[in-house]
């Protein structure tokens, strides 16, 4: 083969690079004082390491999950004093704040013209709920024929250390059953075996769940010794039509992480949900900064759950909104806009005097119509 001067030049250049590398390979080995198993290159070998092209690296703020924390879970109520009495007397919540708000900023935030709201925050353990009564305008009740597989279904899961005592407390206070009674999930279901659960309803027909984890399941804090019957809120659950579509919203855009999965069916699950033939794909998600989880309930069967009403408003009693704290509301709003998710608010809305504990917020619907309130403190 005939070598051109250019070819010879490239060969000489290659030899000049390979020679020091060969020497470096012969002299490699852990240096005295270096960590065990970590190989430190001699200086001559470092000098000839190939240069790596500059790659763009996202800043810490850009790469951080959009949602920092699940702050609380909100629901609309018809009679605030009645709801406060129910949640405090029956379930041991404590009132933290009680405020009335009105004005154009809140109208734009909530998507309801002419509103006046009474908003009460109540805590149970480390977690909180936010109850909102619309003094004006009044909204519609929960549909009387609602079922647990309809896609406007949402509940909070309240943890107890003693299901029998918890059920007795609920019966003494004549709560409305949504399950036939407490259910213990079967041993064959590895991810849910031994969990005890019961669905019931508050005075406005909101679904609630009381839940007891067996040893080895659930957050460690639910197993600490306590003299309290009700300990806190583990998660809020929502019915979804398609888990993968919901993951694109909650995981891929909002940055929540999958914490667990399960597929539940059988007579215990049917009587818990009070849906014959219920077979559920369950996916639990968590925010990096803590707070209650968000749990998807996808009914693989039956598939006759109804979609959420398209004209649902925040003043309706079947309205829930889960409050999510974000670090950069504008960045999240832009991402949601480009992916065509449905806004309740016209965009990020600044609210006066941080009356509800945040400076700006927006309401957005997930693929099934569940509302998330994104707030920037």
Residue map of PLM features:
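Vicinal oxygen chelate
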Residues: 25-65, 68-78, 118-131, 136, 142-231, 238, ...
């Amino acid at each position: 083969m005939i070598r051109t001067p250019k070819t010879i030049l490239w060969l000489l250049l290659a030899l000049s690079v390979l020679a020091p590398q060969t020497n470096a390979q012969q002299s490699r080995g852990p240096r005295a004082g270096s960590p065990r198993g970590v190989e430190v290159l001699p200086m001559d070998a470092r000098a000839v390491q190939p240069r790596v092209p500059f790659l763009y690296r996202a800043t810490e703020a850009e790469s951080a999950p959009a949602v920092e924390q699940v702050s609380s879970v909100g629901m609309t109520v018809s009679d605030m004093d009645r709801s406060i009495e129910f949640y405090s007397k029956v379930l041991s919540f404590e009132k933290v704040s009680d405020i009335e708000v009105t004005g154009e900023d809140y109208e734009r935030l909530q998507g309801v013209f002419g509103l006046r709201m009474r908003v009460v925050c109540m805590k149970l353990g480390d977690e909180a709920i936010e109850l909102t009564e619309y003094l004006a305008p009044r909204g519609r009740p929960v549909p009387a024929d609602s079922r647990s597989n309809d896609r406007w279904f949402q509940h909070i899961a309240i943890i107890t250390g003693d299901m029998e005592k918890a059920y007795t407390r609920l019966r003494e206070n004549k709560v409305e059953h949504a399950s036939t009674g407490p259910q213990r999930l079967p041993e064959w279901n590895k991810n849910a075996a031994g969990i005890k659960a019961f669905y019931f309803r508050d005075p406005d027909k909101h679904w609630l769940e009381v839940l007891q984890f067996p040893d080895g399941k659930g957050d460690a804090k639910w197993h600490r010794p306590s003299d309290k019957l009700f300990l806190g809120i583990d998660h809020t659950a929502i019915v979804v039509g398609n888990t993968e579509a919901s993951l694109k919203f909650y995981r891929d855009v909002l940055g929540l992480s999958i914490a667990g999965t399960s597929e539940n069916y059988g007579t215990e699950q049917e009587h818990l949900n009070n849906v014959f033939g219920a077979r559920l794909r369950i996916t639990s998600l968590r925010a990096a900064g803590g707070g209650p989880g968000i749990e998807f309930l996808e009914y693989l069967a039956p598939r006759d759950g109804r979609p959420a009403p398209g004209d649902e408003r925040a003043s309706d009693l079947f309205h829930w909104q889960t409050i999510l704290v974000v670090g950069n509301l504008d960045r999240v709003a832009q991402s949601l806009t480009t992916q065509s998710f449905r806004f309740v608010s016209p965009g990020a809305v600044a609210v006066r005097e941080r009356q509800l504990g945040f400076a700006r917020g927006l309401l957005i619907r997930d693929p099934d119509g569940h509302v998330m309130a994104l707030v920037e403190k």
